[in-house]
Every structure is written in structure tokens, then in C-alpha cells.
């Protein structure tokens, strides 16, 4: 793609999720990059926080690079951007003065990053979860990703919920915590039964996701951890199956739980996997470059 003109061009990609947000600005010709990180940016969980995080990261990149908004094509991929009302509201706040702007779901940016824009079935396992396919004719489709309250099976947050449910059942059966998983959980939240119940009622998706690693760490030595993780694996395999459907597509796992989850998958599922060529941030930048190319083509 040739973008040479008298006005330097930049692309800006934003990847925002339930735990962290990363933004990258890149000069089209020199390929120089600037990258910054911040907190959560999920429209599902907290609109105001998502807006504040994105605004802050964008301003940081403008300061670091000296670029102006009118020189930039930006694609912002956020968890929860499927909510049309919230998306329109946020786009109205963020899009002003940019050369061109697109707000989409983090599932879309993950999908295009997973296999560098080539056909693929992408499964994102982070604080939340979602599946998506990109076929040879360019058609894309999403599966799952309904958010923590009614979906997100296979995610870090839902694995955390499985841990809590298991330990609460243990308390009911024994009137005390006996498993290694339960004891590790109490150590992590710095309290016993009462604190556990209080924590459970107040916890956000990111909090539930923060305890998910315990199931992996204790899998080999704790039956309760093994039971919980086995259910998580079933949920992930179901999401993979639903996402692929009738498409014979390679599968890419992305997100913070992708690598920890892989060793426990069924061998038949493992044969479907290929290594990712990129991530959601790469996908956002890929889409931003496409957006800039389209804008330039329309204006020539």
C-alpha cells in the first residue's frame, strides 16, 4: 500500500479488555512505533472507565510521537462494543478530529490479528471469552461473547466463578475448607469463610479472573482443582466446536488463558491448532491500515 503524501500518515490500534488496554501508534512510511498500556476498557463492565482509559492512552501517544489526530487512522477494539448504544456514545466522544475512525469489538481485532487477515477460527480466552471465524470470501461471524453475566464460558472470569462455586460447596459439605485449592484461595483473598462469601458477592469479572491461575497451579496435587479445570476445558472445547461449525478452518487460541489451557485439551482438538501470527492489537493496526487505504482511495 502506498500512502505517500505531503501529510504524514499514522495508524493507531487500541486493544481494550476487562483487565488491560494496549494502544500502538505507527508511522506508515518509517514504521516507527510507539506503544502504551493502561487499565481496563470494557464497555460491558464500565463505560466511563473504558472512555477514560482510551482517552488517556491516545493522548499519551500523541504526546510521545508529536502526531496530530488529523494524520491518524484509528481502530479501537473493545470488549462489549457489540452494544450499539454504548458504542455510538463512545465513538462520538473519541472520533473527533481523527482522519478516519472505527470502533469495533475486541473479537474482530483478535480475529484479524490471529492469522494476519487470512481464514481462521479464532478463540479468545481472557477475562472474557469469544469465538469468531473469518472465511476465504471475507465473511466473518462471532460466537459467544455475551458478557460475564450470561456467557463467557471458558474465560478467566468464569473459571474463577467455578473455583468459588467449588469451594462454597466444599464449605457446605464439610463446614470447613479442606482442599488445597480452597486454602490457596483463602490465602489469596486474606481471609476465611466470611471473607470468602463477602469477596464473592463484591467481586468483578477481573477479580474472578485473578484467581483463575490457582486451578492450573494446583491441578496435579488437588482433586478439587482438577475437577474445576476439567470443566473449564470442556467449556473451551465446546466454544471451539461451536465456533468452527461446518467450516474446516485452522484454530488460533488467543488471550491470557490460551497457553495455560492448551496442554489440557483433547489431542483431536490440539491437531486443529496453529500458532497465532498476531494478537488483537496487531489486528487493530491491520484494520486501521485497511481503513486508511480505503480513505485514501476514495479521496483520489
Task: Annotate each PLM feature.
Residues 81-177:
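Phosphate-binding/catalytic loop of phosphoryl-transfer enzymes
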Residues 1-72, 93, 113-121, 164-300:
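ATP-binding/phosphotransfer module of carbohydrate and carboxylate kinases, centering on a glycine-rich
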Amino acid at each position: 500500500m502506498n500512502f505517500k503524501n505531503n501529510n504524514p500518515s499514522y495508524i493507531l490500534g487500541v486493544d481494550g479488555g476487562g483487565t488491560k488496554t494496549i494502544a500502538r501508534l505507527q508511522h506508515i512510511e518509517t514504521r516507527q512505533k510507539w506503544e502504551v498500556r493502561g487499565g481496563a476498557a470494557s464497555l460491558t463492565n464500565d463505560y466511563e472507565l473504558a472512555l477514560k482509559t482510551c482517552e488517556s492512552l491516545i493522548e499519551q501517544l500523541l504526546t510521545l510521537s508529536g502526531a496530530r489526530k488529523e494524520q491518524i487512522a484509528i481502530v479501537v477494539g473493545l470488549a462489549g462494543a457489540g452494544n450499539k448504544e454504548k458504542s455510538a456514545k463512545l465513538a462520538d466522544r473519541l472520533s473527533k478530529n481523527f482522519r478516519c475512525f472505527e470502533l469495533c469489538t475486541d473479537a474482530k481485532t483478535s480475529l484479524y490479528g490471529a492469522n494476519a487477515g487470512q481464514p481462521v477460527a479464532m478463540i479468545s480466552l481472557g477475562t472474557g471469552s469469544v469465538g469468531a471465524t473469518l472465511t476465504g470470501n471475507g465473511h466473518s461471524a462471532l460466537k459467544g461473547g455475551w458478557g460475564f453475566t450470561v456467557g463467557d464460558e471458558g474465560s478467566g472470569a468464569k473459571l474463577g466463578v467455578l473455583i468459588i462455586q467449588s469451594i462454597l460447596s466444599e464449605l457446605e459439605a464439610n463446614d470447613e475448607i479442606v482442599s488445597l485449592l480452597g486454602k490457596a484461595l483463602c490465602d489469596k483473598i486474606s481471609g476465611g469463610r466470611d471473607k470468602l462469601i463477602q469477596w464473592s458477592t463484591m467481586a468483578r469479572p477481573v477479580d474472578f479472573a485473578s484467581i483463575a491461575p490457582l486451578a492450573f497451579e494446583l491441578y496435579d496435587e488437588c482433586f478439587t482443582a482438577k475437577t474445576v479445570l476439567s470443566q473449564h476445558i470442556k467449556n473451551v472445547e465446546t466454544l471451539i466446536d461451536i465456533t468452527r461449525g461446518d467450516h474446516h478452518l485452522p484454530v488460533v487460541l488467543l488471550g491470557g488463558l490460551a497457553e495455560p489451557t492448551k496442554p489440557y485439551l483433547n489431542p483431536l482438538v490440539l491437531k486443529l491448532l496453529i500458532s497465532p501470527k498476531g494478537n488483537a492489537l496487531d489486528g487493530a493496526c491491520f484494520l486501521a491500515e485497511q481503513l486508511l487505504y480505503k480513505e485514501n482511495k476514495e479521496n483520489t
